[in-house]
Amino acid sequence: MSERGNRKTQIGVVVSDKMDKTVVVKVDRLIKHSVYNKYIKRSAKYKAHDVDNSCKTGDRVLIVETRPMSKDKRWKVRQIIERNA
């Protein structure tokens, strides 16, 4: 499967798997405060397409940007990096 261009990728943790073929992935990132020079953790939640319904809550996954699949869903699960034990 060839891909066009360089698509954005994110690594995050699945926080919800209650929807059919969709998971909610929480992605954390660190930003540096401009005045205090302290690193602050920021997080964002993305809805991602899970074709096989194979992701479970707590799994660490790699998501890749894709075409819009619905109103909120613009990411697709590429691989499960680590299963929740």
Swiss-Prot record:
- CDD domains named among the record's database cross-references: Ribosomal_uS17
One of its Pfam families is: Ribosomal_S17
Any Gene Ontology CC annotation: cytosolic small ribosomal subunit
> Which Gene Ontology MF annotations are present?
rRNA binding; structural constituent of ribosome
Give the superkingdom in one word. Answer: Bacteria
GO aspect biological process, one term = translation
Q: Which UniProt keywords apply?
A: Ribonucleoprotein, Ribosomal protein, RNA-binding, rRNA-binding
**Protein task:** One of the primary rRNA binding proteins, it binds specifically to the 5'-end of 16S ribosomal RNA.
Assigned protein family: Belongs to the universal ribosomal protein uS17 family.
Q: How does it assemble?
A: Part of the 30S ribosomal subunit.
This one is known as Small ribosomal subunit protein uS17
The species is Geotalea daltonii (strain DSM 22248 / JCM 15807 / FRC-32) (Geobacter daltonii)
